[in-house]
């Protein structure tokens, strides 16, 4: 059974009785709380974008308040630790899932949807997943490969120095090396078989 088979396709007419759907760390009660909380948010604001515009003066303030809102409302509907996991604290952590969502919504190119028109790409901070952290650590941008807010700011500052108008532009390209090719962002035996080695700045010009 799919998500839409279970809950329906209309956020205002949900079928939430007896759901057994779960996702990774989210138990059925967490999934149910997530759907109900989003439905309530749509009823109050009309869209997630409108909620952001109402919840803060800028996208960062809105993100912080959005997380507080979703955590509080979700807890009232039975959401547990799995639910809270979806809404990482953007003040203390990189909050990669939330920032990936913002990248999709705000940036507009062949990779990202860009359906939110009230924010600019220059407002976005970077997304620090495992691959970006490995790249940044091996490149000397950060001192440890941990997903902290401090490291998020340092990585964003690095890419913003390259492109102040769109610092998150490089996330897809850099992380894709790790996702698709297993890149370690440094000289490694994998470089010997990588099809991108000749154009890669991290390979150290490995000869195959």
What name fits each language-model region?
Residues 1-208:
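HhH-family (HhH-GPD) DNA N-glycosylase catalytic core used in base-excision repair
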């Amino acid at each position: 059974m799919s998500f839409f088979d279970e809950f329906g396709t209309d956020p205002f007419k949900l079928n939430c009785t007896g759901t057994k759907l779960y996702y990774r760390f989210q138990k059925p009660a967490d999934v149910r709380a997530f759907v109900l909380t989003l439905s309530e948010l749509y009823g109050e604001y009309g869209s997630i974008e409108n909620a952001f515009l109402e919840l803060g003066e800028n996208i960062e303030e809105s993100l912080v308040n959005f997380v507080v809102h979703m955590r509080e409302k979700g807890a009232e509907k039975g959401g547990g630790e799995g639910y809270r996991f979806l809404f990482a604290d953007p003040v203390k952590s990189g909050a990669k899932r939330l920032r990936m969502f913002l990248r999709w919504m705000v940036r507009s190119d062949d990779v990202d949807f860009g359906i939110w028109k009230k924010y600019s790409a220059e407002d976005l901070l970077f997304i620090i997943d495992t691959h970006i952290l490995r790249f940044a650590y091996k490149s000397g941008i950060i001192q440890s490969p941990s997903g902290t807010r401090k490291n998020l700011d340092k990585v964003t500052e690095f890419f913003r120095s390259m492109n102040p108008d769109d610092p998150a532009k490089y996330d897809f390209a850099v992380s894709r090396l790790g996702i698709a090719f297993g890149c370690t962002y440094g000289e490694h035996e994998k470089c010997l078989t990588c099809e991108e080695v000749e154009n890669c700045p991290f390979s150290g010009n490995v000869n195959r």
